[in-house]
Amino acid sequence: MSDLGAVISLLLWGRQLFALYSGNDVTDISDDRFPKPPEIANGYVEHLFRYQCKNYYRLRTEGDGVYTLNDKKQWINKAVGDKLPECEAVCGKPKNPANPVQRILGGHLDAKGSFPWQAKMVSHHNLTTGATLINEQWLLTTAKNLFLNHSENATAKDIAPTLTLYVGKKQLVEIEKVVLHPNYHQVDIGLIKLKQKVLVNERVMPICLPSKNYAEVGRVGYVSGWGQSDNFKLTDHLKYVMLPVADQYDCITHYEGSTCPKWKAPKSPVGVQPILNEHTFCVGMSKYQEDTCYGDAGSAFAVHDLEEDTWYAAGILSFDKSCAVAEYGVYVKVTSIQHWVQKTIAEN
């Protein structure tokens, strides 16, 4: 409950008011700073308090967060009794969101913390990739990222100690475990659990998981990362680019020659075939020929829902080898893996 604060609300209907709660402190209000409320005819003073959360957290409760002292000296909420609320992290609400006039291959620098869900993962051979914070203790990345410099026989227990992970402004966080998707050869996804919850703030914030499909053809999303830039060197600065969702038929034809299994043949212009199936969608290049590149995998295709003013992870970048040479990057649909994600988090 460390993120839970409480303040007193006063109603001139109750008994004698004796204390003011603020944060984790209880202050006696019998002195001059907090004078006793004046009495009113045919009425009384009732004392109660209301829980509130710190910045970047919100109250989760079936009640209203207001607790009243009953005759047994118990603090009770009308809806939930003595059950306390929780403060959960806000997701998808960056303080300084990216906007369309700002424009990682040739992308613009993220100087304002527009992508607080973006994490940086480094393998034991110093290869940099991306990961995406989805709550205070869990991140999504690709299975390929987790297996970098490991044999196919490596287990999740073998992999976890070899990874270094940073969130926010180079904040090192410790990894407790990694969990690979049971069908990771076809669904290129894995989860990372941290040993401790991160403190959510302006620089560190999860992105929301979608309740609907945002991977519609033509929809524009933002992708951030530390991948190779236009000089094919890894960047020390987080960059981002705006990219449109592409037609799946065109994407499959580009990489496999045909959507018909009978006529499919490898024809990737970069010599590596992406995983293309019902769990993926494709994204094209920007009008400036900007694209993702090596090292950006694991980053989110972040979509801004204007009606809700909330950012959602529509996809996780799996194939980051297009580098403005191939026409399409390939992403794992978050809606396709969401049940597995929620189940895995609940069980771990």
Swiss-Prot record:
Domain Sushi, chain residue ranges per copy: 34-87
A Gene Ontology cellular-component term: extracellular space
SMART domains noted in UniProt: Tryp_SPc
Gene3D superfamilies referenced in this protein's UniProt entry, alphabetically: Complement Module, domain 1, Trypsin-like serine proteases
Alphabetically ordered keywords of this record: Disulfide bond, Hemoglobin-binding, Secreted, Serine protease homolog, Signal, Sushi
Chief site of localization: secreted
Record-annotated disulphide pairs: 251-282, 293-323
Tissue: In adult liver the amount of HPR mRNA is at the lower limit of detection, therefore the extent of its expression is at most less than 1000-fold that of the HP1F gene. No HPR mRNA can be detected in fetal liver. Expressed in Hep-G2 and leukemia MOLT-4 cell lines.
Domain Peptidase S1: 104-346
Pfam families with a match to the protein in the record: Trypsin
Subcellular location: Secreted
Signal sequence annotation: 1-18
Molecular-function annotations in GO: hemoglobin binding; serine-type endopeptidase activity
PANTHER family named among the record's database cross-references: COMPLEMENT COMPONENT 1, S SUBCOMPONENT-RELATED, HAPTOGLOBIN-RELATED PROTEIN
Function (record text): Primate-specific plasma protein associated with apolipoprotein L-I (apoL-I)-containing high-density lipoprotein (HDL). This HDL particle, termed trypanosome lytic factor-1 (TLF-1), mediates human innate immune protection against many species of African trypanosomes. Binds hemoglobin with high affinity and may contribute to the clearance of cell-free hemoglobin to allow hepatic recycling of heme iron.
Notes concerning its domains: The uncleaved signal sequence interacts with HDL fluid lipids and mediates incorporation into the HDL particle.
Protein name: Haptoglobin-related protein
Organism in which the protein naturally occurs: Homo sapiens (Human)
Gene: HPR
